[in-house]
Amino acid sequence: MSSFANRDVISVRDFTRKELEELLSHAEEMERVYERGGDDRLSGKILATLFFSPSTRTRLSFESAMHRLGGDVISLGGKEAASTAKGENLADTVRTVEHYCDVIVLRHPKEGAARLAAELTDVPVINAGDGANQHPTQTFLDLYTIMKEKGRIGGLRIGLLGDLKYGRTVHSLAYALALFGAKIHLISPEELRMPSHILEELEQIGAEVEEHRDLEEILPDLDVLYVTRIQREMFPDPEEFERVKGSYKVTRELIEEHARSDLVILHPLPRVDEIEPDVDELPQARYFDQVRNGVIVRMALLDLILGGG
Protein backbone atom coordinates (compact mmCIF):
# COMPACT_ATOMS: atom_id res chain seq x y z
CA MET A 1 0.00 0.00 0.00
CA SER A 2 1.31 3.43 -0.94
CA SER A 3 2.16 5.91 1.82
CA PHE A 4 -0.13 8.33 -0.07
CA ALA A 5 -3.25 6.15 0.20
CA ASN A 6 -6.21 8.18 1.54
CA ARG A 7 -3.76 10.87 2.62
CA ASP A 8 -4.22 14.63 2.80
CA VAL A 9 -1.78 16.76 0.79
CA ILE A 10 -1.54 20.06 2.63
CA SER A 11 2.14 21.02 2.77
CA VAL A 12 5.38 19.77 1.27
CA ARG A 13 6.65 19.73 4.85
CA ASP A 14 4.38 16.77 5.58
CA PHE A 15 6.43 14.52 3.27
CA THR A 16 9.85 12.92 3.48
CA ARG A 17 12.27 12.80 0.60
CA LYS A 18 11.57 9.08 0.26
CA GLU A 19 7.85 9.76 -0.12
CA LEU A 20 8.48 12.45 -2.72
CA GLU A 21 10.69 10.02 -4.62
CA GLU A 22 7.82 7.51 -4.54
CA LEU A 23 5.55 10.07 -6.17
CA LEU A 24 8.13 11.04 -8.80
CA SER A 25 8.71 7.38 -9.64
CA HIS A 26 4.98 6.78 -10.02
CA ALA A 27 4.74 9.86 -12.23
CA GLU A 28 7.20 8.20 -14.62
CA GLU A 29 4.83 5.25 -14.88
CA MET A 30 1.84 7.56 -15.21
CA GLU A 31 3.48 9.43 -18.09
CA ARG A 32 3.18 6.26 -20.15
CA VAL A 33 -0.52 6.05 -19.24
CA TYR A 34 -0.91 9.70 -20.27
CA GLU A 35 0.75 9.03 -23.63
CA ARG A 36 -1.65 6.14 -24.27
CA GLY A 37 -4.59 8.48 -23.67
CA GLY A 38 -5.33 7.38 -20.11
CA ASP A 39 -7.28 4.46 -18.66
CA ASP A 40 -10.21 3.81 -16.32
CA ARG A 41 -8.49 2.86 -13.06
CA LEU A 42 -10.39 5.57 -11.11
CA SER A 43 -13.77 4.80 -12.64
CA GLY A 44 -16.49 5.35 -10.04
CA LYS A 45 -14.39 7.86 -8.08
CA ILE A 46 -15.40 11.53 -7.84
CA LEU A 47 -13.12 14.53 -7.38
CA ALA A 48 -14.54 17.82 -6.09
CA THR A 49 -12.70 21.04 -6.94
CA LEU A 50 -13.52 23.87 -4.52
CA PHE A 51 -11.85 27.08 -5.67
CA PHE A 52 -12.56 30.14 -3.53
CA SER A 53 -9.83 32.18 -5.25
CA PRO A 54 -9.06 32.39 -8.97
CA SER A 55 -7.39 29.57 -10.86
CA THR A 56 -7.35 28.31 -14.40
CA ARG A 57 -4.35 26.03 -14.77
CA THR A 58 -4.45 24.22 -11.44
CA ARG A 59 -8.18 23.51 -11.57
CA LEU A 60 -8.16 22.37 -15.20
CA SER A 61 -5.03 20.30 -14.60
CA PHE A 62 -6.66 18.38 -11.74
CA GLU A 63 -9.89 17.93 -13.68
CA SER A 64 -7.98 16.70 -16.74
CA ALA A 65 -5.96 14.30 -14.59
CA MET A 66 -9.09 12.81 -13.04
CA HIS A 67 -10.88 12.43 -16.37
CA ARG A 68 -7.82 10.75 -17.94
CA LEU A 69 -8.02 8.07 -15.24
CA GLY A 70 -11.73 7.47 -15.80
CA GLY A 71 -12.99 9.41 -12.78
CA ASP A 72 -15.65 12.09 -12.55
CA VAL A 73 -15.43 15.72 -11.41
CA ILE A 74 -17.79 18.10 -9.63
CA SER A 75 -16.80 21.74 -9.26
CA LEU A 76 -17.47 24.83 -7.20
CA GLY A 77 -15.74 27.99 -8.40
CA GLY A 78 -16.04 31.50 -9.76
CA LYS A 79 -19.11 33.52 -8.78
CA GLU A 80 -20.73 30.44 -7.28
CA ALA A 81 -17.80 29.97 -4.87
CA ALA A 82 -17.75 33.65 -3.98
CA SER A 83 -21.45 33.51 -3.16
CA THR A 84 -21.02 30.37 -1.09
CA ALA A 85 -18.12 31.93 0.80
CA LYS A 86 -20.34 34.87 1.76
CA GLY A 87 -23.28 32.81 2.95
CA GLU A 88 -21.67 29.69 4.41
CA ASN A 89 -18.46 29.16 6.32
CA LEU A 90 -15.74 26.89 4.95
CA ALA A 91 -16.34 24.23 7.58
CA ASP A 92 -19.98 23.78 6.59
CA THR A 93 -19.07 23.72 2.90
CA VAL A 94 -16.46 20.97 3.14
CA ARG A 95 -18.55 18.93 5.58
CA THR A 96 -21.31 18.98 3.00
CA VAL A 97 -19.21 18.37 -0.10
CA GLU A 98 -17.35 15.40 1.40
CA HIS A 99 -20.56 13.39 1.02
CA TYR A 100 -20.54 14.02 -2.73
CA CYS A 101 -16.98 12.91 -3.52
CA ASP A 102 -13.94 10.78 -2.76
CA VAL A 103 -11.33 13.57 -2.70
CA ILE A 104 -11.45 17.37 -2.39
CA VAL A 105 -9.07 19.78 -4.14
CA LEU A 106 -9.26 23.13 -2.35
CA ARG A 107 -7.95 26.60 -3.14
CA HIS A 108 -8.69 29.34 -0.62
CA PRO A 109 -7.31 32.85 0.00
CA LYS A 110 -6.84 32.24 3.73
CA GLU A 111 -3.62 30.64 4.96
CA GLY A 112 -4.36 27.45 6.86
CA ALA A 113 -7.72 26.86 5.16
CA ALA A 114 -6.65 23.55 3.63
CA ARG A 115 -5.36 22.22 6.95
CA LEU A 116 -8.65 23.18 8.61
CA ALA A 117 -10.65 21.46 5.88
CA ALA A 118 -8.58 18.30 6.24
CA GLU A 119 -9.23 18.21 9.99
CA LEU A 120 -12.98 18.46 9.43
CA THR A 121 -13.50 15.86 6.70
CA ASP A 122 -13.03 12.14 6.29
CA VAL A 123 -12.11 12.29 2.59
CA PRO A 124 -8.60 13.32 1.52
CA VAL A 125 -8.02 17.05 0.96
CA ILE A 126 -5.44 18.34 -1.53
CA ASN A 127 -4.25 21.90 -1.04
CA ALA A 128 -4.29 23.78 -4.37
CA GLY A 129 -3.03 26.97 -2.72
CA ASP A 130 -3.90 28.66 0.57
CA GLY A 131 -3.08 32.35 0.40
CA ALA A 132 0.67 32.99 0.37
CA ASN A 133 1.32 29.80 2.30
CA GLN A 134 1.70 26.53 0.34
CA HIS A 135 1.09 25.05 -3.10
CA PRO A 136 2.40 21.48 -2.77
CA THR A 137 1.25 19.99 -6.07
CA GLN A 138 2.98 22.78 -7.98
CA THR A 139 6.16 21.78 -6.18
CA PHE A 140 5.62 18.13 -7.08
CA LEU A 141 5.38 18.96 -10.78
CA ASP A 142 8.36 21.33 -10.53
CA LEU A 143 10.48 18.56 -9.02
CA TYR A 144 9.36 16.15 -11.74
CA THR A 145 10.21 18.67 -14.46
CA ILE A 146 13.67 19.31 -13.03
CA MET A 147 14.30 15.59 -12.69
CA LYS A 148 13.22 14.96 -16.29
CA GLU A 149 15.31 17.78 -17.69
CA LYS A 150 18.45 17.28 -15.59
CA GLY A 151 18.30 13.67 -14.46
CA ARG A 152 18.77 14.70 -10.83
CA ILE A 153 18.03 17.43 -8.31
CA GLY A 154 20.81 17.06 -5.76
CA GLY A 155 23.80 19.31 -6.39
CA LEU A 156 22.05 21.45 -9.00
CA ARG A 157 22.33 25.23 -8.69
CA ILE A 158 18.75 26.45 -8.78
CA GLY A 159 17.78 30.12 -8.81
CA LEU A 160 14.39 31.27 -7.49
CA LEU A 161 13.60 34.69 -8.94
CA GLY A 162 10.96 37.31 -8.19
CA ASP A 163 8.44 37.54 -5.37
CA LEU A 164 9.95 35.34 -2.69
CA LYS A 165 8.01 37.07 0.09
CA TYR A 166 4.43 36.36 -0.97
CA GLY A 167 4.96 33.69 -3.65
CA ARG A 168 3.58 30.41 -2.29
CA THR A 169 5.15 28.33 -5.06
CA VAL A 170 8.69 29.23 -3.99
CA HIS A 171 7.88 28.72 -0.30
CA SER A 172 7.00 25.10 -1.05
CA LEU A 173 9.70 24.55 -3.66
CA ALA A 174 12.62 25.87 -1.59
CA TYR A 175 11.91 23.34 1.15
CA ALA A 176 11.65 20.43 -1.28
CA LEU A 177 14.83 21.42 -3.10
CA ALA A 178 16.62 21.47 0.24
CA LEU A 179 15.44 17.92 0.97
CA PHE A 180 17.02 16.79 -2.30
CA GLY A 181 20.30 18.62 -1.69
CA ALA A 182 20.07 21.32 -4.35
CA LYS A 183 22.02 24.56 -3.99
CA ILE A 184 19.43 27.32 -3.69
CA HIS A 185 20.02 30.86 -4.98
CA LEU A 186 17.35 33.37 -3.92
CA ILE A 187 17.12 36.38 -6.26
CA SER A 188 14.79 39.23 -5.32
CA PRO A 189 14.57 42.88 -4.33
CA GLU A 190 15.25 43.48 -0.64
CA GLU A 191 11.53 44.15 -0.13
CA LEU A 192 10.60 40.73 -1.52
CA ARG A 193 13.25 38.53 0.06
CA MET A 194 12.33 35.11 1.37
CA PRO A 195 10.61 35.35 4.80
CA SER A 196 12.97 34.86 7.72
CA HIS A 197 11.07 31.87 9.12
CA ILE A 198 11.58 29.98 5.86
CA LEU A 199 15.27 30.91 5.75
CA GLU A 200 15.63 29.63 9.31
CA GLU A 201 13.86 26.41 8.39
CA LEU A 202 16.14 25.88 5.39
CA GLU A 203 19.16 26.43 7.62
CA GLN A 204 17.88 23.89 10.14
CA ILE A 205 17.70 21.16 7.50
CA GLY A 206 21.19 21.98 6.26
CA ALA A 207 20.31 23.68 2.99
CA GLU A 208 22.95 25.56 1.03
CA VAL A 209 21.34 28.96 0.40
CA GLU A 210 22.62 32.24 -1.04
CA GLU A 211 20.71 35.50 -1.50
CA HIS A 212 21.25 37.82 -4.46
CA ARG A 213 19.86 41.09 -5.79
CA ASP A 214 21.49 40.97 -9.25
CA LEU A 215 20.20 38.30 -11.66
CA GLU A 216 22.80 38.98 -14.33
CA GLU A 217 25.62 38.31 -11.87
CA ILE A 218 24.47 34.84 -10.80
CA LEU A 219 22.79 33.70 -14.05
CA PRO A 220 25.91 32.14 -15.66
CA ASP A 221 26.24 29.75 -12.70
CA LEU A 222 22.68 28.43 -12.68
CA ASP A 223 21.43 25.05 -13.89
CA VAL A 224 17.78 26.03 -13.39
CA LEU A 225 16.10 29.45 -13.22
CA TYR A 226 12.63 29.41 -11.64
CA VAL A 227 10.84 32.67 -12.38
CA THR A 228 7.77 33.93 -10.52
CA ARG A 229 5.52 36.86 -11.21
CA ILE A 230 4.94 39.67 -8.74
CA GLN A 231 1.24 39.32 -7.94
CA ARG A 232 -0.69 42.47 -7.14
CA GLU A 233 -3.37 40.54 -5.27
CA MET A 234 -0.85 39.20 -2.74
CA PHE A 235 0.21 42.65 -1.53
CA PRO A 236 -1.66 44.10 1.47
CA ASP A 237 -0.14 47.52 0.65
CA PRO A 238 -0.69 48.74 -2.96
CA GLU A 239 2.23 51.16 -2.60
CA GLU A 240 4.57 48.27 -1.88
CA PHE A 241 3.48 46.60 -5.11
CA GLU A 242 4.09 49.79 -7.10
CA ARG A 243 7.63 50.02 -5.71
CA VAL A 244 8.65 46.51 -6.72
CA LYS A 245 6.65 45.66 -9.84
CA GLY A 246 8.83 45.05 -12.87
CA SER A 247 11.93 44.50 -10.70
CA TYR A 248 13.21 41.75 -12.98
CA LYS A 249 12.68 40.89 -16.61
CA VAL A 250 14.05 37.82 -18.37
CA THR A 251 14.82 38.77 -21.96
CA ARG A 252 16.14 36.83 -24.91
CA GLU A 253 19.24 39.02 -24.92
CA LEU A 254 19.91 38.33 -21.24
CA ILE A 255 19.67 34.57 -21.73
CA GLU A 256 21.73 34.46 -24.92
CA GLU A 257 24.51 36.61 -23.46
CA HIS A 258 24.73 35.37 -19.88
CA ALA A 259 23.05 31.96 -19.43
CA ARG A 260 24.44 28.50 -20.02
CA SER A 261 23.18 26.69 -23.09
CA ASP A 262 21.79 23.91 -20.88
CA LEU A 263 19.99 26.24 -18.48
CA VAL A 264 16.38 25.25 -17.79
CA ILE A 265 13.93 28.15 -17.37
CA LEU A 266 10.76 27.36 -15.42
CA HIS A 267 7.71 29.42 -14.43
CA PRO A 268 4.53 28.30 -12.59
CA LEU A 269 2.43 30.55 -14.86
CA PRO A 270 0.58 32.70 -15.58
CA ARG A 271 3.20 35.31 -16.37
CA VAL A 272 2.82 39.06 -16.66
CA ASP A 273 5.92 40.75 -18.08
CA GLU A 274 8.73 39.00 -16.18
CA ILE A 275 9.56 36.72 -19.15
CA GLU A 276 9.37 38.31 -22.58
CA PRO A 277 7.45 36.25 -25.19
CA ASP A 278 10.44 35.77 -27.50
CA VAL A 279 12.19 33.81 -24.73
CA ASP A 280 9.65 31.06 -25.49
CA GLU A 281 11.56 30.28 -28.69
CA LEU A 282 14.81 29.54 -26.84
CA PRO A 283 15.80 25.94 -26.06
CA GLN A 284 16.14 26.83 -22.38
CA ALA A 285 12.41 27.61 -22.03
CA ARG A 286 10.61 24.68 -20.38
CA TYR A 287 7.61 26.31 -18.69
CA PHE A 288 5.05 24.90 -21.10
CA ASP A 289 6.52 21.44 -20.51
CA GLN A 290 5.73 22.09 -16.85
CA VAL A 291 2.05 22.38 -17.76
CA ARG A 292 2.06 18.93 -19.37
CA ASN A 293 3.99 17.50 -16.45
CA GLY A 294 1.42 18.97 -14.08
CA VAL A 295 -1.31 16.75 -15.49
CA ILE A 296 0.95 13.70 -15.28
CA VAL A 297 2.02 14.33 -11.69
CA ARG A 298 -1.55 14.99 -10.58
CA MET A 299 -2.64 11.76 -12.28
CA ALA A 300 0.05 9.98 -10.26
CA LEU A 301 -1.02 11.69 -7.03
CA LEU A 302 -4.71 10.92 -7.49
CA ASP A 303 -3.92 7.31 -8.34
CA LEU A 304 -1.79 6.91 -5.20
CA ILE A 305 -4.40 8.55 -2.96
CA LEU A 306 -7.52 6.88 -4.36
CA GLY A 307 -6.21 3.69 -5.91
CA GLY A 308 -3.17 2.97 -3.81
CA GLY A 309 -0.89 3.00 -6.84
From Swiss-Prot:
Residues holding carbamoyl phosphate: R57, T58, R107, H135, Q138, L269, P270
MF GO annotations: amino acid binding; aspartate carbamoyltransferase activity
Annotated catalysed reactions: carbamoyl phosphate + L-aspartate = N-carbamoyl-L-aspartate + phosphate + H(+)
Stored Pfam families: OTCace, OTCace_N
Xref: HAMAP family: Asp_carb_tr (MF_00001)
Annotated function: Catalyzes the condensation of carbamoyl phosphate and aspartate to form carbamoyl aspartate and inorganic phosphate, the committed step in the de novo pyrimidine nucleotide biosynthesis pathway.
NCBIfam families: asp_carb_tr, PRK00856.1
UniProt-recorded name of the protein: Aspartate carbamoyltransferase catalytic subunit
Natural source organism: Methanopyrus kandleri (strain AV19 / DSM 6324 / JCM 9639 / NBRC 100938)
